[in-house]
């Protein structure tokens, strides 16, 4: 064995490549070993250093792959054992054990997290060269007994199913020990680069290779200063020193110092020396030179998005200077926090990248499909699961519009559960759903699912066969091919499909002869797919590489950007969270010398120093270290390592927000510039100098010219939210000349509430989602129908009998039977409505002097100027003197307010008065008023009553009164009835004013509607809060940002409120 160390200013790879070349020139076969995470990059680096740029004598690979070179022909043809297969084997083992067999883990038998921990423990045991019987000294002896039962049973299943229990390294080591590879290894040289520690499995293999290979060469970075130190605790080279010292002691050799021809920039060497001096308690009498600072940058940004954008701009600048994407490396402090954001931002700046991390399959449509299939079976055809399965695009041949129509109907008819899905759809509504088409679609969905879900407990092999038959019926494979929209997606889908078929194969192999329920089968496949990962190799090498910062090696790329280096992530603190604690691992390691667990937490300090050292020397030309103030929506501090750099004299640059400028980094990329122009177009203008304004004026002129060529435009508006007028063609179709504009009191209220709401409801005719379950609209219909029947009954029957008959016959109507007898909730609603009817009906019995002239009276009121107002009057009453009045039933409290009417928000009663005046063209003296009747079951607070007497009954009847507009002329006749006339009496002239102003409201609204321009203007009564319908989901209206667009209501003091509003009405309606 030969151990080599060198300073950070030299290239260890070049030194080791020279050693490899010498061995290759002598006829030896050379294996150049790199860590798993670096083998691809190391291969490119080694081949670049070779003069011939390639050779068959030097193979750059990993330990595992090297073992396959030697054992590929001699290894037994057994099944491969991966993590998913291991999880299934442990699941099968746990199925065979009873809870009482496992005192410690019996309750976790079906827990997926526990099974994952078993898989990790089993892999750890293999890497540590330990068996489950070596797990002595655990906190609870019962734990070892349970683990022995589980793992031994799992290993028995592996033997039965012919799985290879040995890892590739174990098979390689066994072949070496048996002397099967002596001839090959005698002509082999092993070169190892990039390691600072070996696992127990690698350590054992290395001892065998050292005895049988021609030579083993290992290199590591250690400074000469550190190598000569006797005390190395806390030294930045502590990990490498321990690594070399352990090897030197074990193999009785002395490490040698070597140098390379390539020497990196002195600035990085000087920074390393300062960093080393800080941690080995020595001092230096110099600081970084001014020109050294050109190679380092410390950035501070507010949050992640700004940080990534600054990096993207800097990368575009490097390209402008002539460098390539492959010259750039981006390192992430927190891979999970940055992974979702960095892709879209780099795409915006048109920067191709390769994320060096396996992607989880959990977000792929195929996994979502399998999960929905499993949940559909487990939860008995729940609607959400069936729809999610369809929306994955992998079930059958359905268009998106078909799925939307199916979803709309199933929500309306409340289709959920197998019983409802299996029966033909028969319920329809005013929208007239295409039931024939929907039933055909229902059959295409239900039949294959029903055939699969009726499977009883049977052999796993039979279940897999039925699953495959089901996949064929729904055209799963063909649909999977149709998902891809690009070559990259095709490659991703191929990898996902391969993992899917591997999981099915493993399940068939492990559970083929085991009896299982379909639910267990689907759950196992789902769990395997959700935990699986896949990796796609980039189509070109000229990409920006992105990976976690703790995987970096010295001198990786000319330009390195390390972002997210906050105190929480740099340094990283790694802790085990498996079935064994670190203390238990340590006790086991004390007993076993050469077989041991890796305890990450015990090596955090020296590993973090090693990582920081590699990071500070990762670049050969320029290193940028960046930290956000806010990461994952939480504030974080500077890393202690970055604070050290600041103490060395490196300035911390506050990058600030990404304001637009005319620097190359801002305008050098068309797509990024366009996106920023759009962003600034949507926000308030920032302050600019005259020079900036001139520049951006020219740029906008140029951009608009380019956009016109592509038929695109940048909208401009004075408000954050704006609407466009309808075109003349649309106006002619929606409001044709010669045909009156149809309005109603409700439509007018909606218009004055928010014009855009009127546009949605009455121009686009958009409706809310329907439902067969009774809502306030259907409740109102029921109450109206009961009172209509009651008031039509002129027989001599007692009033209570009439009421019972009205309720009974209404309940027997087919529509109400269908609505209110569907389930217990609907029956409960009906019971409440019946109580409301019984509570409100007495008010009709008291007013025996009233004669009901008509009910549910349709009217069409001609307002002139091609405006036709239509509606339905619930009831027309006649007093004893012949005067007429209107009653409007309400299921909620309503009261006429003259201020609300003035602002257009309560025109109903006055509109009905105008209609009654047209229907019965008599003098206004014959109208006694228009009123609301609140249909309610009055609630009284008994605490306020000292005793139960007549005052209690009076309070009930007081709540059941008519409230609205009343004629002052009819005051005497109204005083004997249940009319609330206080502050509600109007003279004939005042009633005429109300009628004329009501007409003015309709004419004003109609004029605006016919122009076809509808504003987003919900009303506000105080200028501080918005009471109108904001329609946030559609308009994105925000009260704090868009208050200027809200319509301010006219409000007046309570004193003389009525007279002041009437004066305003006369003025505005020109009376």
From Swiss-Prot:
EC supergroup of this enzyme: hydrolase
What is a single molecular function from GO for this protein? helicase activity
Q: What is its EC number?
A: 3.1.-.-
What keyword terms does UniProt attach to this protein? ATP-binding, DNA damage, DNA repair, DNA-binding, Exonuclease, Helicase, Hydrolase, Nuclease, Nucleotide-binding
- Alphabetical list of Pfam families matching this protein: ADDB_N (PF21445), PDDEXK_1 (PF12705)
Cofactor(s) annotated in UniProt: Mg(2+)
| GO process terms (BP) | double-strand break repair via homologous recombination
What remark does the entry add? Despite having helicase-like domains, this subunit does not have helicase activity.
Describe, as the record does, how this protein assembles with itself and its partners: Heterodimer of AddA and RexB.
Similarity field: Belongs to the helicase family. AddB/RexB type 2 subfamily.
Name the job this protein performs: The heterodimer acts as both an ATP-dependent DNA helicase and an ATP-dependent, dual-direction single-stranded exonuclease. Recognizes the chi site generating a DNA molecule suitable for the initiation of homologous recombination. This subunit has 5' -> 3' nuclease activity but not helicase activity.
Q: What PANTHER family does the annotation carry?
A: RECBCD ENZYME SUBUNIT RECC
Protein name per the record: ATP-dependent helicase/deoxyribonuclease subunit B
Q: Which organism is it from?
A: Streptococcus pyogenes serotype M28 (strain MGAS6180)
Q: What is the lineage of its organism?
A: Bacteria, Bacillati, Bacillota, Bacilli, Lactobacillales
């Amino acid at each position: 064995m030969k151990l080599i160390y060198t300073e950070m200013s030299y290239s260890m790879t070049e030194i080791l490549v020279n050693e490899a070349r010498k061995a290759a020139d002598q006829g030896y076969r050379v294996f150049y070993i790199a860590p798993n995470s670096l083998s691809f990059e190391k291969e490119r680096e080694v081949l670049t250093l070779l003069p011939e740029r390639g050779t068959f004598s030097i193979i750059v690979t990993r330990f595992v792959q090297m073992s396959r070179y030697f054992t590929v022909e001699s290894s037994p043809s057994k099944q491969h054992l991966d993590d998913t297969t291991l999880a299934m084997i442990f699941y099968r083992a746990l199925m065979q054990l009873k809870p009482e067999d496992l005192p410690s883990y019996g309750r976790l038998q079906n827990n997926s997290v526990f099974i994952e921990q078993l898989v990790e423990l089993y892999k750890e045991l293999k890497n540590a060269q330990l068996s489950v019987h070596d797990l002595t000294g655990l906190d609870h002896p019962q734990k070892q007994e349970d683990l022995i039962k589980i793992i031994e049973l799992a290993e028995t299943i592996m033997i039965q199913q012919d799985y290879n229990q040995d890892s590739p390294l174990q098979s390689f080591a066994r072949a070496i020990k048996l002397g099967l590879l002596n001839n090959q290894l005698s002509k082999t040289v092993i070169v190892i680069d990039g390691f600072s520690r070996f696992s127990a499995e690698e350590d054992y293999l290395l001892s065998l290779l050292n005895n049988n290979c021609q030579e083993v060469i290992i290199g590591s970075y250690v400074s000469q200063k550190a190598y000569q130190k006797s005390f190395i605790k806390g030294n930045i080279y502590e990990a490498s020193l321990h690594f070399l010292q352990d090897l030197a002691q074990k193999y009785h050799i002395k490490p040698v110092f070597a140098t390379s021809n390539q020497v990196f920039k002195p600035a990085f060497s000087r920074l390393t020396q300062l960093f080393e001096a800080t941690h080995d308690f020595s001092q230096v009498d110099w600081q970084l030179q001014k020109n050294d600072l050109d190679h380092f940058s410390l950035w501070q940004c507010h949050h992640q998005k700004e940080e990534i954008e600054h990096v993207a701009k800097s990368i575009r600048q490097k390209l402008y200077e002539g460098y390539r994407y492959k010259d750039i490396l981006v390192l992430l402090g927190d891979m999970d926090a940055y992974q979702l954001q960095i892709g879209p931002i780099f795409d915006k700046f048109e920067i191709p990248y390769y994320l060096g991390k396996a992607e989880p399959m959990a977000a792929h449509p195929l996994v979502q499909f399998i999960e929905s299939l499993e949940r559909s079976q487990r939860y008995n055809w729940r609607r959400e699961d069936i729809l999610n399965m369809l929306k994955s695009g992998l079930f059958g041949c359905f268009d998106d519009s078909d799925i939307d129509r199916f979803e709309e109907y199933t929500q309306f008819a409340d289709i959920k559960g197998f019983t409802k899905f299996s029966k033909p759809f028969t319920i329809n509504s005013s929208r007239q759903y295409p039931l024939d088409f929907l039933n055909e679609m229902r059959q295409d969905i239900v039949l294959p699912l029903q055939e699969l879900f009726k499977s009883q407990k049977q052999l796993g092999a039979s279940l897999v066969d039925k699953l495959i038959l089901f996949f064929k019926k729904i055209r799963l494979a063909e649909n999977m091919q149709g998902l891809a929209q690009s070559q990259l997606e095709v490659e991703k889908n191929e990898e996902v499909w391969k993992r899917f078929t591997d999981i099915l194969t493993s399940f068939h192999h492990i559970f083929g002869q085991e009896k299982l329920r379909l639910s267990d089968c689907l759950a196992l496949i789902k769990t395997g797919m959700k935990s699986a990962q896949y990796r796609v190799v980039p189509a070109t090498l000229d990409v920006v590489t992105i990976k976690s910062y703790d995987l970096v090696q010295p001198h990786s790329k000319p330009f390195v950007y390390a972002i997210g280096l906050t105190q929480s992530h740099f340094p990283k603190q790694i802790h085990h969270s498996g079935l064994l604690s670190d203390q238990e691992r340590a006790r086991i390691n004390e007993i076993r010398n050469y077989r041991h667990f890796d305890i990450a937490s015990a090596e955090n300090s020296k590993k973090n120093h090693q990582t920081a050292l590699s990071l500070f020397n990762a670049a050969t030309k320029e290193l940028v270290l960046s930290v956000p103030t806010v990461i994952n929506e939480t504030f974080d501090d500077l890393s202690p390592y970055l604070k050290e750099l600041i103490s060395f004299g490196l300035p911390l640059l506050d990058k600030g927000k990404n304001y637009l400028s005319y620097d190359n980094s801002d305008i050098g990329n068309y797509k990024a510039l366009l996106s920023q122009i759009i962003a600034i177009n949507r926000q308030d203008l920032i302050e600019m100098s005259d020079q900036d304004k001139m520049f951006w004026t020219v740029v906008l002129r140029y951009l608009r010219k380019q956009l016109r060529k592509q038929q695109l435009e940048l909208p401009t508006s004075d408000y954050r939210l704006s609407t466009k007028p309808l075109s003349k063609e649309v106006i002619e179709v929606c409001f044709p000349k010669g045909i009156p504009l149809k309005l109603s009191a409700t439509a007018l209220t909606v218009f004055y509430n928010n014009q855009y709401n009127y546009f949605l409801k009455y121009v686009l005719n958009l409706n809310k989602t329907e439902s067969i379950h009774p809502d306030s609209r259907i409740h109102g219909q029921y109450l109206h129908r009961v009172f209509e029947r009651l008031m039509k009954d002129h027989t001599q029957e007692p009033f209570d009998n009439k009421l019972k008959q009205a309720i009974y016959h209404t309940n027997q109507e087919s529509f109400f039977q269908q609505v209110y007898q569907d389930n217990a909730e609907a029956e409960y609603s009906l019971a409440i409505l019946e109580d409301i009817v019984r509570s409100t009906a007495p008010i009709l019995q008291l007013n025996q002097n009233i004669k009901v002239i008509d009910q549910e009276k349709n009217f069409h009121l001609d307002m002139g100027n091609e405006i036709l107002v239509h509606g339905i009057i619930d009831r027309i009453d006649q007093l004893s003197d012949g005067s007429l009045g209107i009653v409007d039933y309400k299921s909620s409290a309503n009261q006429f307010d003259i201020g609300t009417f003035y602002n257009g928000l309560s025109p109903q009663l006055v509109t009905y008065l105008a209609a009654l005046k047209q229907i019965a063209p008599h003098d206004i003296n014959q109208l006694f008023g228009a009123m609301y009747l609140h249909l309610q079951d009055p609630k009284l607070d008994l605490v306020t009553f000292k005793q139960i007497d007549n005052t209690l009954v009076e309070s009930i009847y007081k709540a059941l009164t008519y409230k609205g507009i009343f004629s002052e002329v009819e005051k005497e006749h109204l005083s004997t009835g249940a009319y609330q006339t206080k502050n509600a009496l109007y003279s004939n002239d005042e009633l005429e004013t109300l009628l004329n102003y009501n007409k003015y409201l309709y004419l004003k609204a109609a004029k605006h509607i016919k122009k076809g321009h509808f504003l987003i203007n919900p009303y506000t009564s105080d200028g501080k809060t918005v009471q109108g319908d904001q329609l946030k989901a559609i308009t994105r209206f925000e009260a704090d940002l868009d208050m200027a667009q809200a319509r301010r209501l006219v409000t007046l003091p309570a004193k003389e409120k009525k007279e002041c509003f009437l004066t305003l009405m006369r003025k505005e309606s020109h009376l």
